[in-house]
Amino acid sequence: ALGNIPQPPYPRVSALRLDGVPWKYPLVPLKLGVFQEIRDNIIKEDPYPAHGWFIFRQNPVNSLPERRKTIEAFNKLDFIVTVDISMNDTAWFSDVVLPEATYLERYDPLAVVDDTIFIRQPVVEPMYESKPGLWIFKELGQRLGLGDYFQYEDEEDYLRQQLAPLGITLEELKAKGYYRPPATEEAAGTELVFNTPSGKIELYSSTLANSGFQPVPIWEEPVTNEANTFFLLTGKVAQHTQFATHNNKLLHERVPTNPMWIHPNPAGERGIADGDDIWVESAGGRVKAVAHVTEKIRPDCVYMTPGFGHVSKGLVTAYGQGTSDSDLHLTFTDPVSGSQALSQTTVKVEKVSS
């Protein structure tokens, strides 16, 4: 196993978490949380008024449903800090932006996939005033009087401390790019077990039952959309990563916008042809999009790629390009996992009149 960076114990926090874990979502792991719940609880001031938000490698203005609510939450805060590689939509609304170096300019903490350790190492120096995340947080910690929680000299020292129990050097790992420990034989009689109380596959989940949820799957009638509406579907494309790469000129040339897919039958009923401007409206908002008429979509659904419709003028290439699905999606949160259900929103579609 990788070594840990020495730290003193964290102080005990008695206040409830803003994301509802575990007081509202008892089964959601503490390290994951429920992102959209932070936004909603800031607005409701539940369980207390919030004053600031420190955001790292997240973009709630573009990634959360109901963008108007996210901006409403921001307006209730006194101070917002964003650490990111670009002036994304969330950074645009922040009081302070700390520019992070990109993955080509920094080390990251070592990652383990199955039994193999991989290293990400810089190939060029950071540009302008950007700094690696490990540097940013160490500097912040020291300036806040919390330097004991960041006991490493620099990025390479951080990685060396991680490697210490394995008996290999950082130079060896950098040269090879990965490390796989020697194979070992399993002890006789050792069996693989599942991460359940019984160690077996559980058709009846005592974990769910003890938290007040249905312990077995139950039948629920499928949600149906109202007449003249469509389920709004979204899905990523291979050319872009999450919401972070749309300002990259090379990737933008390949996927510059996000037309809305609609089946020929409902499109014909509405007089919509491929390439027409259309209005798309949900209970959350109304946006203009471009129609892509195709049989690759169900007649009761429409589809669009997320990550477009940026409002930050700092994104000189991506600003104003395409349509934001965040202006349409409503917030549906699974009570067990805390995940967002992004296929429940229904929309109306009509052609833009000339």
Located regions from the model:
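Long, contiguous, secondary-structure-rich segments that constitute the structural scaffold
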Residues: M127, G133-G177, L250-M260, P266-S354
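Residue-identity detector for glutamine
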Residues: Q7, Q36, Q58, Q121, ...
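Extended redox/cofactor-interaction regions of prokaryotic respiratory oxidoreductases
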Residues: A1-W92, T102-D108, V123, K174-K176, ...
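Short strand-coil-strand connectors
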Residues: F118, T190, P197, E281-G285
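Catalytic alpha/beta core of large soluble enzyme barrels
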Residues: L98-P99, T323
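A signal for specific C-terminal beta-sheet/loop modules enriched in small/flexible residues
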Residues: E100, P217-P222, C301-G309
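Glycine/threonine-rich phosphate-binding loop and adjacent beta-strand/alpha-helix elements that clamp
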Residues: L104-P126, F137, G141
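Catalytic, metal-anchored helix/loop core of enzyme active sites in primary metabolism
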Residues: D95
